[in-house]
Amino acid sequence: MRRAERSPAPPACGLRVDPYGFERPEDFDYAAYDEFLSAYLAVLTRRALKWSRLLQGDSGLRRTATVKRYIRKGVPLEHRARVWLAVSGAQAQMEQNPGYYQRLLRGERNPELEEAIRTDLSRTFPDNVRFRKMAQPCLQKALSDVLLAYGLHNPGVGYCQGMNFIAGYLILITKSEEESFWLLDALIGRILPDYYGPAMLGLKTDQEVLAELVRVKLPAVAALLDGHGVLWTLVVSRWFICLFVDILPVEISVLQTVLRIWDCLFNEGSKIIFRVALTLIKQHEAFILEATGVPDICDKFRQITRGSFVVECHTFMQKIFSHPGSLSMTTITRLRESCRAALLAQR
Amino acid sequence: MAETYDFLFKFLVIGSAGTGKSCLLHQFIENKFKQDSNHTIGVEFGSRVVNVGGKTVKLQIWDTAGQERFRSVTRSYYRGAAGALLVYDITSRETYNSLAAWLTDARTLASPNIVVILCGNKKDLDPEREVTFLEASRFAQENELMFLETSALTGENVEEAFLKCARTILNKIDSGELDPERMGSGIQYGDASLRQLRQPRSAQAVAPQPCGC
């Protein structure tokens, strides 16, 4: 079997596989990464101290303005699972339903669901050594169980491609199937609109909402896409479906960026996705406007999710709250209603 | 770098999840098997310039997610496709059973004249076969499709599938059955043919194209 040629050994300063099991790409820029990391480590240390103090205090993790500010500045890795569980309401659900996850897996089986999940097991994070068949332990089993339990728990959604990346990512971070299950439930059941159901109406709606926001905030980009007849589905459906996992390339440097986005997603809700999308587009507006055709537009939208802008997660996360300008939940709700009505009328 | 070509054809790769659509596209474009691949979310895109019957043709290929529910998202990309690879997995009867639905989508949403080649992929897994060659060729005949069994792993018949589809479209253009100028034909003239159209006839014979069959 032919395989892509591998480059020679990586430089001694870095490991080929990051602490989460992701293989670094051959063109990984170790020097730039080290430079970023040495600055970011100082931030992480400072944040870790502040978080320890916050979590020791009596007020704990109620959703206060302080907690929101802290979360926007990044949750330290050691507290991440706990914070996600608390602010998303997953912890409360888990405590109210002890043993529920295990019971789902022991319950009645659904061969169709199992088959759909099986098709994607080896296609989830193929560049992560822990998800490989030969890994000990192999996370494919945990992934399969979490997805299966979720499909049985929420038969209206069942399994939709993209959920595998989200569940896989939750497993890597929480290292717990049950916690991953409840966090997945928080995302799909409460935080996100109907992205994954059979009609994918929430996904289609939010794509249109983003298009509307771009029309108002970045009219030249909207005109470019409209002029070439490019539907927003083509360039952004993966952003919504995968919540930027596997979009922003997943080695640890950028993984930080996705983690930071998810910190805010669990606490502040789906609005964050629009902030990230608008920031990516706005930051690269001139670059996108160079595109001359449909393939070129697709390619540019792919490229803007790479490079130093997204790697430098601390600056990136500051920008998502300033770059796109005001974005009230009232606006989003109003746009969701009108776009949804328009989509339903088209059917 | 500017590419010159006589025609541009829009192609689709459609079929159920896990049949190897993206691997076929990857094999065709990169000439190798994609070992560790993610499944496609939404729509992906690839292109390659090929030489068919003395004409250079740029194939603009849209690769779609196979899971049923994504069809409502990917259907918008069918419009104006000139050709399609309709893919099933020879080791999965289920993927074969859903061919009719995919075909209806292609003919109603792209164009009734879309040129479709049926590809029975994973030919290299013959011991696990669930769909016979004969059965699939009968289906192809009944539905006026071309048919090949392919292997994205070994590359067998992959190039042929794309070229056969392109050649048929070119023949239909030559015979007048397809009109590239019709809106939504999925066919565009490239720079090369536009130049030829503008040049006096005598200049056209200067650079004969090699035959790529």
From Swiss-Prot, chain B:
Top-level taxon of origin: Eukaryota
Classification via PROSITE patterns? RAB
Residues noted as binding GTP in the record, renumbered to the chain: 18-23, 37, 39-40, 66, 121-122, 124, 152-153
Q: Catalytic activity annotated for this protein?
A: GTP + H2O = GDP + phosphate + H(+)
PTM comment: the record says: Serotonylation of Gln-67 by TGM2 during activation and aggregation of platelets leads to constitutive activation of GTPase activity.
In chain numbering, motif Switch 2 lies across 65-74
Compartments annotated for it: namely: Cell membrane; Early endosome membrane
Note the topology in the membrane: Lipid-anchor
Q: What is its EC number?
A: 3.6.5.2
Per the record, residues carrying Cysteine methyl ester are: 213
Instruction: Show where the record puts the motif Switch 1.
Output: 39-44
What this protein needs as a cofactor is: Mg(2+)
- Signal peptide (from-to): none
The PTM N-acetylalanine maps to: 2
Q: Which Pfam families has this protein been placed in?
A: Ras
Quick check: keyword RNA-binding in the entry?
no
Query: What's one GO BP annotation on this UniProt entry?
Result: early endosome to Golgi transport
Activity control mechanisms: Regulated by guanine nucleotide exchange factors (GEFs) which promote the exchange of bound GDP for free GTP. Regulated by GTPase activating proteins (GAPs) which increase the GTP hydrolysis activity. Inhibited by GDP dissociation inhibitors (GDIs).
Binding-site residues for Mg(2+), renumbered to this chain = 22, 40, 63
The lipid modification S-geranylgeranyl cysteine is placed on: 211, 213
Q: How does it assemble?
A: Interacts (GTP-bound form) with RUFY1; the interaction allows endosomal tethering and fusion.
Domain notes per entry: Switch 1, switch 2 and the interswitch regions are characteristic of Rab GTPases and mediate the interactions with Rab downstream effectors. The switch regions undergo conformational changes upon nucleotide binding which drives interaction with specific sets of effector proteins, with most effectors only binding to GTP-bound Rab.
**Family designation:** Belongs to the small GTPase superfamily. Rab family.
State what this protein does.
Answer: The small GTPases Rab are key regulators of intracellular membrane trafficking, from the formation of transport vesicles to their fusion with membranes. Rabs cycle between an inactive GDP-bound form and an active GTP-bound form that is able to recruit to membranes different set of downstream effectors directly responsible for vesicle formation, movement, tethering and fusion. RAB4B mediates endosomal tethering and fusion through the interaction with RUFY1 and RAB14. Acts as a regulator of platelet alpha-granule release during activation and aggregation of platelets.
NCBIfam families per the UniProt record, alphabetical: small_GTP (TIGR00231)
Q: What is this protein called?
A: Ras-related protein Rab-4B
This protein's species is Homo sapiens (Human)
